Amino acid sequence: MNSPHSPILCVITDEDTSPLDMVPRALRGGANMIQLRRKTASGRELCRLAEALIPFCRQAGALFIINDRADIALATDADGVHLGQDDLPVAAARQLFGPGKIIGASTSSVDEALKAERNGADYAGFGHIFPTGSKAKGYKPLGPEAISLAAAALRIPLIAIGGITRENAGPLISRGAAGIAVISAVTKAESPEEAARSLMAIMNTTRAGEGT
């Protein structure tokens, strides 16, 4: 996964919103990566949701990533899997997938991000950058300054996550993030389509202003 020409807007599904309703709206707004994250869902339900959502992503030219479950990603021919620090190791997932699938890794330090890169990750999810209520965290927000350090150290794209809104997204791109991952900023919005469109516009404007 090379550094993309367009900023990455990864919309992660939540437990409270129907992805079958939200995802098509987010895609219409310009989201170019969808991550299916349903911690309480059975394998059967995840397969059902993935098979329903993948056609929307294919039509929109967006990537479809499964959170945690490499087996579901393989079974449904998703574009890839996103792995946390307590999930299947990145190196093992790369052996399982070969070169044809995308592997993302959740990281919260430059060392974790570099390790993920060495082990075959295609991108590093990096955060949480700002305070967030979407997921319980046992450490303080890293702050936007950490983006600069991590982006300078990595060859793979870095996707910032955690408490990101339209008010704070632009500076993260300025500091070297290839994109952002959001949950509530889109899933809880009155219009997921407009929320996604606004976030993508902010990132594109920031990049254009830097001549990249």
Swiss-Prot record:
Q: What class of enzyme is it?
A: transferase
Matching Pfam families: TMP-TENI (PF02581)
Tell me what organism the protein belongs to.
Chlorobium luteolum (strain DSM 273 / BCRC 81028 / 2530) (Pelodictyon luteolum)
- Which residues of the sequence carry a binding annotation for 4-amino-2-methyl-5-(diphosphooxymethyl)pyrimidine? 35-39, 67, 106, 135
The name on file for this protein is Thiamine-phosphate synthase
Q: In which pathway does it act?
A: Cofactor biosynthesis; thiamine diphosphate biosynthesis; thiamine phosphate from 4-amino-2-methyl-5-diphosphomethylpyrimidine and 4-methyl-5-(2-phosphoethyl)-thiazole: step 1/1
Q: What HAMAP family would the database entry show? A: TMP_synthase
Family to which the UniProt record says this protein belongs: Belongs to the thiamine-phosphate synthase family.
Q: Which domain of life is it from?
A: Bacteria
